[in-house]
């Protein structure tokens, strides 16, 4: 029975993957210019792709920079991870971008190397490592500050979650960042054309947001990374996964009154919390470390509106179900299917019929990296970056508060 479920889910995944790929840009005109040096921290899925979605930071670097890309350093604690990644890249059209990559096994080792070889300073640092290893002022988790202490004008692309430290410690990092640095945090959904169109409508019509409602229904059967199912390692599904929709909620609604947050959950041991196609053996996880199946949260925004958010771990197969709604006087804006084929529906005072906005082949990951890399190179305005470190810490604060609410 379990194998049949997994087999069917895998077939669904392959179909969805092919469909997604057909809508993403596969190539771009070859960029021209001098070599652009990148150091990549982490050999995991966010930097080099997974079966679960279109995220793949190295691929976006290749698409934006073309053969200008030179990956000068690759960091991971495991030699086998280096070998796997470099072997894969050696078989692609961008093999030359990885031909002279130096391998390092810790941030300290790499930064000490740069101390004695400052001429090898990269043009950008791509940080896609577990949150407990960065985003803090504490030794061993102070990667951003360690880099910027040496190179105050460094350009850092940092994946979410921004930290695993206490929230105040993450805010302390934000306060210590030099103004000349260029920092972008990987909340790519902000770059969707549907999201930007919704923001444009709100601004043009001078609307005050009354409410946001965000829904994230996760497909879990392929999520076999055990750490994801352990609260203390992943931070929980809201911090690790639902963060994108908490972030979009803030993007539309503004800063949150943290003390106003109210939460209800379906826990793993509730009658409706049993999952029949678990990809990991949950018996090996201590009961107090098991994650909730459903989380519902609500809060007040500082501007007076109300936010609501739900995260659900019940879908099988591969396709996620996502939606965010924004309401203001006379206007109802709704964006659906944000990971695959986003569509914006807008009802306005002009008509009860919704106006539909679609943007085929929109790749927010590409847009995100294009803006960041242009800013890093001095060709673009860093104010065009939609998510900086401080803003990402505010999203982290919201997700932590939801996770820790009793």
Swiss-Prot record:
Matching InterPro entries: Gfo/Idh/MocA-like_OxRdtase_N, Gfo/Idh/MocA_Oxidoreductase, NAD(P)-bd_dom_sf, OxRdtase_put_C
Principal location: cytoplasm
Record field: transmembrane: none
GO molecular function, one term: nucleotide binding
SUPFAM superfamilies: Glyceraldehyde-3-phosphate dehydrogenase-like, C-terminal domain (SSF55347), NAD(P)-binding Rossmann-fold domains (SSF51735)
Disulfide bonds: none
The protein's name: Uncharacterized protein UNK4.17
Protein family membership: To S.pombe SpAC12C2.04.
Pfam families: GFO_IDH_MocA, ox_reductase_C
Gene Ontology cellular-component terms listed: cytosol; nucleus
Origin organism lineage: Eukaryota, Fungi, Dikarya, Ascomycota, Taphrinomycotina
Location(s) in or outside the cell: Cytoplasm; Nucleus
Domain of life of the native organism: Eukaryota
Keywords, comma-separated and alphabetical: Cytoplasm, Nucleus
